[in-house]
């Protein structure tokens, strides 16, 4: 096999590979000899089938394997001999307009096998000195007021409702049980019908204006509720449209007293109110710490990004940009928006998000090299913990989710990647100066610019919600 390097430009490499016909012939005969004792052909004793007859029966199928093995061998030889680190799998090209002829002649061992191997290699770079890097860690402790607000919400959400006396009108804060049928232009629409639906008036659970029109209703009343779906409604076919709902009120119940006491704590599995307060404070603090970590990580990645400048493999950038751009287009579609609505153009947005893709690739390569240099590993136990955490998100489908990940190495790798990244980030944090800075809740949860919010590599944390105390209540209750 002859391998000749023909191109070496930046991160691109090209090699010309030639496997002469006589070598193909030798490889074919070797493979046929190897299967001689394994095949059974009528009229021949086992192991006594002439190679010429084997070639007649199995020649083309065996030669196809020979050719595939030759291509794989060439790729491996190039990578090993040149000490290359590949960005993506090699591309194989045959001479234009001659591919079919070359392959057919090679299959018959009547012609040379000639092809080109195109590669993109990973860039080489030295890890930067980070001793001069200083980043802020935002610190916020839960206040008594925040804990009490969360307790009030928990008490409100867990309170009981008692039926109002016969003939009583529904008030804001009451819970009504209703049947409804929605229509647009006189036609019922999907998702517009419900039976025995409990609705707390004033909770803003339904479309704006819907609940207000049920205040004053009595059991047995039928009302025509007229509303307009918001322009940004998640169901595109309904967004911005006027609708009418025929509503029948079947029950009206008043909320019970909201008490924050030991009984409330026991309803949430705690011994007493003090234990519940501790759990709520811990849950809120955990959310604050998670948001602080997101901000700290972003500032660290910003600092890393400013420390490196090297060529990026075009294929990796293209791949990353395609993924980012698909998210952008899906987001616009979901919100029913255009680039013009966002005050930009498609071309300007593509340029902006291409920079984001480049940043992700660059930081991904840096973090990978840091991890390799520091010999950072993710254990199987850690991957299993992540897998079981993922499985718990799909109650009732545990086995299907488990089987999916165990039978899909790529999916399992996607669980391992963020674990590896967090370990690398922790390692890098140990190389920089971290200064704690007390901040307000507003400052902690202030959103970054959209372009900056997308960080590097696998770091794709979602923007947090400022209503974190609701999640904290769930955690404390869990």
Curated annotation (Swiss-Prot):
Stretches assigned to the PPIase FKBP-type domain: 173-258
Domain of life: Bacteria
UniProt cross-references to InterPro entries, sorted A to Z: PPIase_dom_sf, PPIase_FKBP_dom, Trig_fac, Trigger_fac_C, Trigger_fac_C_sf, Trigger_fac_ribosome-bd_bac, Trigger_fac_ribosome-bd_sf, Trigger_fact/SurA_dom_sf
UniProt subcellular location: Cytoplasm
Renumbered residue ranges of the record's region Disordered: 154-173, 441-478
Chain intervals with Basic and acidic residues compositional bias: 154-167
Catalytic activity, EC: 5.2.1.8
Annotated coiled-coil segments of the chain: none
Assigned keywords, A-Z: Cell cycle, Cell division, Chaperone, Cytoplasm, Isomerase, Rotamase
Gene Ontology BP annotations: 'de novo' cotranslational protein folding; cell division; chaperone-mediated protein folding; protein transport; protein unfolding
Catalytic activity annotation: [protein]-peptidylproline (omega=180) = [protein]-peptidylproline (omega=0)
GO molecular function: peptidyl-prolyl cis-trans isomerase activity; protein folding chaperone; ribosome binding
GO cellular component term, pick one: cytoplasm
Family statement: Belongs to the FKBP-type PPIase family. Tig subfamily.
Function in brief: Involved in protein export. Acts as a chaperone by maintaining the newly synthesized protein in an open conformation. Functions as a peptidyl-prolyl cis-trans isomerase.
Record remark: domains: Consists of 3 domains; the N-terminus binds the ribosome, the middle domain has PPIase activity, while the C-terminus has intrinsic chaperone activity on its own.
Name of the featured protein: Trigger factor
Native source species: Methylorubrum extorquens (strain PA1)
Gene name linked to the record: tig
